[in-house]
Amino acid sequence: MGSAALPHARQRWVSHALDSNRKFLIANAQMENCAIIYCNDGFCEMFGYSRVEVMQRPCTCDFLTGPDTTKSSIAQLTQALLGSEECKLEILYYRKDTSCFRCLVDVVPVKNEDGVVIMFILNFEDLAQLIAKSSGRSLHHRLSQSWRAGEGRRLKFSLPSLRRLKAQRNSLPTSEFDGVAIDYGKPGGDSLILRDLKTSPKENCVQSETESLLEKERRPSLEADPTLQHPIPKQEPPSLGPRGSYSAWGFIRSRPGGSFHSLRRVSSLDNFEAARSEFQRKFRERRANSEGGMGLSGKASHVKPNPPNSTSDSDLMKYRTISQIPQFTLNFVEFNLEKHRSGSTTEIEIIAPHKVTERTQNVTEKVTQVLSLGADVLPEYKLQAPRIHRWTILHYSPFKAVWDWLILLLVIYTAVFTPYSAAFLLNEEQGEEKHWNCSYSCDPLNIIDLIVDIMFIVDIVINFRTTYVNINDEVVSHPGKIAIHYFKGWFLIDMVAAIPFDLLIFRSGSDETTTLIGLLKTARLLRLVRVARKLDRYSEYGAAVLFLLMCTFALIAHWLACIWYAIGNVERPYMEHKIGWLDNLGDQIGKRYNDSDLSSGPSIKDKYVTALYFTFSSLTSVGFGNVSPNTNSEKIFSICVMLIGSLMYASIFGNVSAIIQRLYSGTARYHTQMLRVKEFIRFHQIPNPLRQRLEEYFQHAWSYTNGIDMNAVLKGFPDCLQADICLHLNRTLLQNCKAFRGASKGCLRALAMKFKTTHAPPGDTLVHYGDVLTTLYFISRGSIEILKEDIVVAILGKNDIFGEPISLYARPGKSNADVRALTYCDLHKIQREDLLEVLDMYPAFSDNFWSNLEITFNLRDADSVPRTPLSEEYDCTYRRVRRRKHSLCQPNKPDPDTGTSDAEQYHTYSELTNPQDPLSKDQWDDVGSSTTPCSQTSDDEAKPGSPTKALSLVTASASGTEVSKQAAESSQSYAGTHICTTPLDIPNMFTFWEDQRPNHHPEPLQHVSLVHSSRDIPLHSDYRPGQIESRLELLQAQLSRLESRMSSDINIILQLLQRQLSQVPPAYSPISPSSHNLAMYGIVPRSLEPLTPCAPLEDEQQTAPGQSPSYAEVEKFHLKSRHSLSSGMHLTVASDETMTVYSEQEHHSPPLLNPEPPHQRAPNTQGLLRGSRFPSLPEHLEASSEHQDIQRHLSDPVLPGS
């Protein structure tokens, strides 16, 4: 099965690979030459090739090699592709612009579940970029960890690298330095051993990784560095010293501009310091002789000292440049010379601790600056930020958003507790002693109310400094304008709600004061308008609306409960008979009121719960009657509550039911549609595999579209709005696809209207083998695979195009492979007829579109394009209509099947029509196989027994008269418009009979070649031998039909000539034909010049009775007369050798015109041939129908020359 049987895990791997940022390609190991089936965008950007140019090429990447690419590297790559193990190698590759670079290629085989390699992944890395990235990495973090670990270690350093630190140290700001900088410059064979460095176990784990990285860097660096003059010391295996220590040569990394030096061994710290001073002196001498020094010391010499705490961008860049210079600063504070440990083979950068602190400080300050969005961090090219006054708060700032939600919670608290406090708490009688002796802070609710009042006052102050948006959509930050805007808006309501009335009238315990406080506190409920405005944005969500409606219902019930208690409490002292609901409540719960005891009666809790129960039962129209109104005031209030309840019940709960129905509407539609699908499956008895695919696709499509039919939605809008919507839906394709660049907005709108969107789940087959390619596909998301005989030949991803090149073929072909989705795919597709229709409307954009359209994979099956008799008739009509399209008119375009241009086709025709080189029977079969029966019609008038001769419709010479020029032009334009497919190869038909050979006809040959060049049909197609006989039979039938049609035309011509002969004056008559009124016939006088007929073809054997000389002259006369009548088609039948078309009835019947002897008939014939052939009868207008009938026959599209 090959790679067609990819498991789901591999499909996920392919989809993940398509989204990676690496530069790679995928090749199929089971195809010839391991053809490339996919390359990502990074690969295309690296080498400059498009995906179309890379697909199906061998993965040996021969197109990337150049003159400097070594054959050994190519052989290594080829050997890696023959193996089954991962391999890395370096190759010199060339980009499309001929620039070369060293590339690191990683060949990774992909195996299937059987362990067989089915694919190769080739990952490409620019070696120069890889070295630049790795050289910029710093190892000081790991070294700082090694110092803190306290483990001894012996390190070997590259002396030239250590020597460069002097220049770096001199360029850095001078400060207290607690480390030792060692610089060396003298080459020698000594080495330096530093012992007792502390390292951590973590570093030991990464040594091998670092060594492998340096190994990869070492070779390219040596090749790229022209200054290297010393050989590279080879790495020696570590050997155990006499005291059990290890001695080893380390890698010496080459850097640009540097040189290699050896290391010498020192045994004490004094020798270490002596060596340090010696090399410092030599370095100063070297630096004096050469400005800037060598290598990295030269880079460091021009760096100016920079304060470590600088925070500007330029200073940070300078300091970053300094920090990237390799530093070898050694701290000997924690050295222990008695402990030895085998050192790493890599160079290690050591940075003094206070330098690390400075870097950390700079990074912290930089991060702080970025987080604060300072002006020096913002880009140079930016929008001008609005100028904000000091202490002004932006209305869209996070602080204002949090503050608004806090005020919203306080308003909700006010809406709940203000009515409760005004109704229940303020009417509670307290002892005078407690009331006067206790301060305001005795009641917790008073403390909370005080905090709420303070917050409302602060909110007023903040609103005076908060920006707003004016009617011009401008942010206003001017304090004066903000104040005016706030005064005109919510200031009065906020001010009333923020006044602490209970503090202003505290300690005045009269009843009037208590009632006033309760009424004033209810003014805070005006802030609920802000709550409604704040929560209005959530009105589109059904669940949020449902929650808000329930809260509103509960809040209104709470308010009504407070009012219900206030009515009963106010009326009770004035009633003689205690019949109020509060007295009834006391009797029911056993807590009767006692006028002498103010604390008697039900508690506040009992009163509130009972009042709330009554209001809820009244609002919901339940009303059990256990709490009933008894007084008139209570009854009136109950009526009001019932009215409010009916309205609220109808609005709120009706809205709730609608919301619930809307929430479940999608589910209901899903179940309804799913039921239809199941009924369809059951009714048609769909098999289980297909049934499962159908159900899975329906479920996924529903989750993707939620059951919304976009076509049904778009049909409800006008065309202009539909075009805008389609343009928005296809904007990504139209903007990113190269083929649509340069299109006008009207063209894009027309194309967007024709595009359809398709969604395909994994495993769904989009195109099957043999399907007619009537659609062009554009992939916008996901990946697909193309399979030929269950072998993956290509993997396409985002922005790829597959189908067939419509501009090269006038008739849709058939698919040569299966197209299957690997992941969930979104595709845009357009029908070829719709695309051609739009391009015909915009011919200026058509050429640009065809030139920029790059089809990633051509699905057209070029080997076999089956044709059926029914499809041929359709093909004729299709080509005839499509020939009028300007979008397909591309001159000198190579033939799609043969790859030949018009000039090559003309040369081919010249060879085929050369009489000196007649075609054999086999050659004729080959030529005939390229012709199609497209030109045959539905009316079958052929006579099987009629003789068939060679046919040649020859275009008359255009050198005679202007009429002949006009006729030739009209004939050529007519032929270019109506001939739809490859016609009978007329000039080559003479070679079908070996006894006949045509003469040279250069002008007709040129006309035929032009006709062929104006079509987009291949001249030669590869047909099987079995089809040649059918082609010959169709050719025979075609000639028979042409013969019968021409016979009927000749009969009409002869009838007309009989009427003309009676009016045309004889040759000896003094009347000149020019005396006729030319305007009556609508013919220009300049057309009176005689027409020179084509010379008759010589026939070797004249055995047919109709081919006698007398008959030939009469036939020539008849056909010459026909030329005068054929104003629409300027065709001339030369002679009987050229064309002898007559029926058996005509052959056996007497001639219509009695032939005269040649000497008597010659003058008449000459007069007819040389004179102007005008219809002599003024009644020629009555015979217009006959002319039209002739034109109708001649304009029949079945004639190959027309």
Curated annotation (Swiss-Prot):
SUPFAM superfamilies: cAMP-binding domain-like, PYP-like sensor domain (PAS domain), Voltage-gated potassium channels. It is a multi-pass membrane protein. One of its GO terms (biological process) is membrane repolarization during cardiac muscle cell action potential. Residues 739-839 are annotated as: cNMP-binding domain. Glycans are attached at residues 437, 594. Residues 213-222, 1179-1195 have a biased composition (Basic and acidic residues). Disulfide bonds: none annotated. The chain crosses the membrane at residues 406-426, 444-464, 486-506, 516-536, 544-564, 636-656. One of its GO terms (molecular function) is inward rectifier potassium channel activity. This is Voltage-gated inwardly rectifying potassium channel KCNH6. Residues 928-937 have a biased composition (Polar residues). Residues 203-243, 285-315, 912-948, 1092-1112, 1140-1202 are annotated as: Disordered. The S4-S5 linker acts as a signal integrator where it both couples voltage-sensor domain (VSD) movement to pore opening and closure, as well as providing a binding site for other domains that regulate activation and/or deactivation of the channel. Gene3D superfamilies: 1.10.1200.260, 1.10.287.70, Jelly Rolls, PAS domain. Keywords: Cell membrane, Glycoprotein, Ion channel, Ion transport, Membrane, Potassium, Potassium channel, Potassium transport, Transmembrane, Transmembrane helix, Transport, Voltage-gated channel. The gene is KCNH6. Pore-forming (alpha) subunit of voltage-gated inwardly rectifying potassium channel. Characterized by unusual gating kinetics by producing relatively small outward currents during membrane depolarization and large inward currents during subsequent repolarization which reflect a rapid inactivation during depolarization and quick recovery from inactivation but slow deactivation (closing) during repolarization. Activates even more slowly than KCNH2.
